[in-house]
Amino acid sequence: MNTNLSFSAPSQVETDCLAVVVLDHSEKDKPAAIVESADTAVRDAAKDVIATGEVTGKAFETTLLHRPAGIRAKRLLLLGGGKAKTFSAAELLKLAGAAVRTLKSKSIRAFAFALPENGVATGIDGNDGVRAIVEGAFVGNFDPDYYKSDRKDQKIDALTIVAKGDQKALEDALQTGRIVGESQNFTRDLVNEPSNRMTPTMLGERARKMAAEVGLKCEVHGADKLKELKMGAFWGVAQGSDEPPALIILRYEPEGATKDVHLGLVGKGITFDTGGISIKPADGMEKMKYDMAGGATMIGAMRAIALLKPKVRVTAIILATENMPSGKAQKPGDVQIAMSGKSIEIINTDAEGRLVLADGLCYARQLGCTHLVDAATLTGAVVVALGYVNVGLFANDDQMYERFAKANKRAGENMWRLPLDDDYKENIKSSIADIVNAGPRHGGAINAAMFLKEFAEDTPWIHLDIAGTAWMEENKPWIAKGPSGVALRSLVEFVKGWAS
């Protein structure tokens, strides 16, 4: 999708469709839907339909007007943004996605989006607004139906954002939004692939190809490297599959980088999870191709980081394998020795994600990473706790948490911190080894995080459990059913924050 800026008045932009935001300014029983544009001609074009009460400004309400009077656009799309008092850049991002999904369903290929009141009335900074619109448009333009034989390629080809302000700053915001939006869709593309096509080897190849395109260093290692590094926890999972595992390492090492900060991103890359010997129910197992979403998120984040060029070192480690039942597979009751030397009693082979992450966190520390973030579709328990709305966030360091929380707020993604009290450590004690890989059902997401904490040790660390948010269970106005690319925007903001 081509993206560009226009500094003309919205009414003077020649386009197939002009999209504008309508916000609900009502108080008590007084309805007041207002078009958020300083352009009188645009407001006049919408005033009659607003006067009927048909347009209220309700969130994601869409009204398409044909041949609107007084403006050059062939159509005018009125996008309801909800209550004016709570409207934010995060809501604007979703509205841009909704605009794209609405218009491409009508075979419209190009449109313009007017920045709400040019960033004044809504209190949204113009640069943040431009970036939100671009990112949201890319999110809305993604469709997961690659393998349909009768697939119709309905995509928006061109987006013009109508804005006012400092041209250089707005162009920088546009470019940032484009990089992040494309990288989020790159992640979604990886996650969307079926597991017979997205094997650990193929994930490594896709990472290697991307790295060559954007200037990252990339290494992809197989089983011999795992054994050399004594990654017993990772290999314990990988040994049950005929598909070879892949240890994927991406390095971003810019000149002039801060010397005392080296960020480590660790991603779970289980390209298909049957549960192993502790096999999952058949119902819904097809979704387990998504179990590499954490790893894909880290690969996509590294793409964005390489293109945005922050002055901070970043290393990503993705631990890719299948979790399969076979005569070679690990069994409940086995004991594995992790890279750190800790012994792990295997209680449930379906608690495999924490095993691969354990060795990934240890390896990141060995490579000199000073601060760690991992992402994984780790537990069903986090879905019970937070539903399909919030990412479960854990941290062993309050300063690290505060820094990440600020980045997350800028990114506009829903995350919620959960506890890591020492009392929970009782849940991962083993009678024959240092720890177990699966504790009791109660506090399941916390138990998994407590397990990982053992391998982060004293290094400041964030754990993101994206099990409930890595894919959309149904179509939303702004995003298609399927992989979401969640957490990528927050990770990019987090990395940028260290360089500023």
List the predicted regions and their residue ranges.
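Short amphipathic alpha-helical segment within the helicase RecA-like ATPase core
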Residues: 1-269
